[in-house]
Curated annotation (Swiss-Prot):
Binds the lower part of the 30S subunit head. Binds mRNA in the 70S ribosome, positioning it for translation. GO terms for biological process: translation. Part of the 30S ribosomal subunit. Forms a tight complex with proteins S10 and S14. Coiled coil: none annotated. It comes from the Bacteria. GO terms for cellular component: cytosolic small ribosomal subunit. Belongs to the universal ribosomal protein uS3 family. Gene3D superfamilies: 3.30.300.20, Ribosomal protein S3, C-terminal domain (3.30.1140.32). It comes from Gluconobacter oxydans (strain 621H). This is Small ribosomal subunit protein uS3.
Amino acid sequence: MGHKVNPIGLRLGVNRTWDSRWYAGQDYARLLHEDLKLRAFLRRKLSGAGVSRVVIERPAKKPRVTIYAARPGVVIGKKGQDIDALRKELSRMAKTDVALNIVEIRKPEIDATLVAENIAQQLERRVAFRRAMKRAIQSAMRLGAQGIRITCGGRLGGAEIARAEKYREGRVPLHTLRADIDYGTATAKTTYGTCGVKVWIFKGEILAHDPLAQDRRAAEQAPQR
């Protein structure tokens, strides 16, 4: 079970919480589609900023969007011009004022989504897949990860028959609910077809029941802008 299910979904309410935090009765479908549109727009617009997560909260007054990015300077722009334009565009899409926060990711090497995207970009640049995977594993272990597992699948190296390659180092206990496991995926669009990249990173155990543990850890690492 633990090997098949998404490790983030399995731990929701234990040591992870949802990326969309709001309640709606009749408007649920509309707000869900709005969240999907906002996330797709931000990932497309900020593709060079290293965006890991987009958290959307909807208090009574106005929606609050928090962007977790490895390069916040790209989001903010010169003298804050880019972030002002981004806020206006989000407000136009949501048809109401939107509050925008940026949280810096200090260690992108141990963020599963960013690691997966980095490997996918290297595959698109025709870097050898084994070299890309091993380099990512070495960087993650050096910066404090207790374990990492990477899977690449597709026509690796332009092979005729698609296959999956896996590399692992350290512990990645997928069945342990108290384990703080980050999971991310990415797709590399190569000339031979698409290759999928999956990354699991084990960062230690969270012994207390704390759904906001990961958010608190990210906030401690970097001040909000």
